[in-house]
Each structure stands twice: as structure tokens, then as C-alpha cells.
């Protein structure tokens, strides 16, 4: 009988109040029920605490804000053998969940991967290139955070996790994961909120993201890039230094 894997879903939250409640409701209805951990660095932690209390979700408070740090700390508290890192503004259905578990149950060589992104929804003008994007992502493309990256827990720690990076943590981890072993990009496609694109425009946002990735590839520090992206000057000055006393796990019952 093939092994049935367990899943821990880690959700980094930074002021995602609008989306968190509905996302937790959807995830709480998955079967078999995964372990769900919200790793929060919001300005108003009390709001997130109340949302997690409503859904009886484990809550992790991480200060100061850093997506890589939030993901790493969430992974440390997780108990399942598969880790799924999922954004609060991204959909995740039973079909996605079944696809994830089935992939590991049927192929013992898989170490991790992500889901295909529905780019037609975000970039309608690029519809003709969606087939190219699919092939590229499945074989050599970077696995971004909004694709719900997943990995065996043992492999995650062997690779050093997200290294606490405040930005480009997904790009960095994707490179390590693809270099290590068999990575699978799964269907069905997932959709994310258009909130970032609606504020700046689709093309401008895409160009901004591409420019940041180019700078990262050229060797610019992720902490400097985080300052540019978030407008938070403290990000570059921290240089990856976080207090070990900044993490608190709350089991909301």
C-alpha cells in the first residue's frame, strides 16, 4: 500500500486581512484536514488573531516583517512531511489538494514543486503565450511564492529553507530545489488576487518585478531590494538579523 502523506500549510500574512478569513475557511474544509499555520507579521496582530480564532488555526507571530523569516519559522513549527507555502490571496481547492497528495503517493522521486499559475487571468494580453509559459514553468522556470510552492519537510531543512530573506526568498529557494532533484509543477492552475496589479497596472507591475529579479541576479542584496519594494529602510539595515525571541506560537481554540 502506498504511503499517504500528511500536509502542513504555512501562510505568511502581512496585513492580508481582506483575504485571510475566506482562505482559512477554504483550507479548513479540505479532506483530509491539513495542519494550517498562519505566520503573521501584520501591523495589527490582534485582527489576525481573531480571524485565526474563528477558524481554530495555529498562529505564529514573527517580528519584524520578513516573508522568508515568516516561512522559515512556520516550517519549524510544522509537523507534517509535506510543507505547502501558500499566499493568503491565492485560491486552493480540494482539486489542488488531491493533485498534491496524489503526486507524492504515486511518484516517490518527487521532492517538491509548485502549481501552474493562471496567467490568462492576470495578463489577458499574453493569452497567446500561455502555452509557452506552461512549458517553461514545468521544466526550467522559477517557482514563485504565489504558485503555492511545496516540498518534503526533510528536503526543506536540508536545503536551508528560505534563509530568512525578506524578498527573493522564492527565487533563491526555487534554484536550490531544482538543482537538488525531481521537481513537479502541478495542475489545476491557481489564481491570485489582482490587488497588486490594480494599484499599479499590470504592465508596470510586471516590469517592476522583472527589474527586481534582474538586480537580484546581478548580486544586489535581497535586503536592499526589500527596501526598494516595501519602502522599508529598516529591511536593508537588518541584514538578516532577527531576534530569536520574536516568535510566538499560539494554538487558537
Region locations from a protein language model:
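Short beta-strand/loop segment that forms part of the nucleotide-sugar
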Residues: 33-43, 60
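Short aromatic/hydrophobic "clamp" motif used to bind/position activated sugar donors
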Residues: 83
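Hydrophobic helical membrane-anchoring modules
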Residues: 1-2, 175-253
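Conserved donor NDP-sugar-binding/catalytic core segment of glycosyltransferases
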Residues: 95-125
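A recurrent flexible, glycine/aromatic-enriched loop bordering the glycosyltransferase active site
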Residues: 112-124, 133-151
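A conserved acidic beta->alpha catalytic loop
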Residues: 40-48, 90
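Short, well-formed alpha-helical segments that are part of the catalytic scaffolds
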Residues: 15-29
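Glycine-rich, basic loop-to-helix element that forms the pyrophosphate-binding segment
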Residues: 62-78
Amino acid at each position: 500500500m502506498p504511503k499517504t502523506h500528511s500536509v502542513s500549510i504555512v501562510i505568511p500574512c502581512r496585513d492580508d486581512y481582506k483575504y485571510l478569513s475566506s482562505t482559512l475557511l477554504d483550507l479548513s474544509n479540505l479532506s483530509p484536514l491539513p495542519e494550517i499555520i498562519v505566520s503573521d507579521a501584520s501591523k495589527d496582530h490582534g485582527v489576525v488573531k481573531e480571524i485565526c480564532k474563528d477558524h481554530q488555526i495555529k498562529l505564529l507571530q514573527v517580528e519584524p516583517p520578513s516573508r522568508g523569516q515568516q516561512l522559515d519559522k512556520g516550517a519549524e513549527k510544522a509537523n507534517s512531511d509535506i510543507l505547502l507555502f501558500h499566499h493568503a490571496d491565492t485560491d486552493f481547492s480540494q482539486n489542488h489538494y488531491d493533485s498534491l497528495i496524489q503526486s507524492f503517493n504515486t511518484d516517490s522521486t518527487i521532492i517538491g514543486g509548485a502549481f501552474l499559475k493562471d496567467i490568462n487571468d492576470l495578463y489577458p494580453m499574453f493569452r497567446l503565450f500561455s502555452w509557452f509559459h506552461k512549458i517553461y514553468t514545468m521544466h526550467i522556470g522559477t517557482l514563485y511564492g504565489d504558485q503555492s510552492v511545496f516540498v518534503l519537510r526533510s528536503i526543506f531543512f536540508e536545503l536551508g529553507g528560505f534563509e530568512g530573506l525578506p524578498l527573493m526568498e522564492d527565487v533563491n529557494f526555487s534554484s536550490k530545489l531544482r538543482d537538488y532533484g525531481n521537481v513537479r509543477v502541478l495542475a489545476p492552475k491557481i489564481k491570485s488576487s489582482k490587488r497588486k496589479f490594480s494599484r499599479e497596472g499590470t504592465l508596470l507591475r510586471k516590469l517592476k518585478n522583472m527589474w527586481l529579479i534582474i538586480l537580484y541576479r546581478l548580486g544586489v542584496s535581497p535586503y536592499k531590494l526589500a527596501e526598494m519594494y516595501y519602502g522599508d529602510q529598516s529591511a536593508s539595515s537588518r541584514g538578516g538579523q532577527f531576534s530569536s525571541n520574536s516568535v510566538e506560537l499560539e494554538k487558537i481554540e
